[in-house]
C-alpha cells in the first residue's frame, strides 16, 4: 500500500513499501527538449501531459527488494544534472536500528538503477530533504545528518566520508532521557529545522 506521496510539478512520487517508488502523472505539464536550456531536466516531465487527478497515469517505477520504502524525494543533481529519486527506508524507529537512503538513478526512466546508498550503521532512517546538492537525513537514534551528495554518486556514501555535519539532539530531560529520536527535517531561511519525538522541535 501507499505510505507517503510527494507531489511536485504535477508528478506524484509514491512510496509503497515492497512495491517501491512509483512516479505518476497527476496533472503535469509536458516539457520538450528545448526546455533543457532553461531548466534542469526531469525526464518524467518529458513523458508527462496525459494525467490528471481524476485520471492518473503511471510513468515509471522501481521495486524495493527489502520491502521498506517509506519516502521518496526527487533530486536533480546541481553538479551532474542526473535525475535521482532518493528512496528512504523505515524499519521501526525506536525498535529498529536499520535502514538508509537509496539513490535511484532515473536519468533513463526506462532503466532505473540504484547507484549509491547512505546508511548509518548504528541508527534507523526516517524522513529526508534535499537542498541543492546536500541531503538532510533524519536518523531516529542517529540524530540529524547532513551529507554532501554532489558529483558522482556511487557505492557506500557513508564509508566515503561525505557526511559534513551531525547533530545529536539527546536531552537528559527528554521524554526518553539522553536518547535522540529524530523524525523529520527541512531547511528554511538559512537554518535547518527538525523534530525529535523525544526532545521537541529544534
What are these model-derived regions, one by one?
Residues 1-202:
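Feature marking well-ordered beta-strand scaffolds used for ligand recognition
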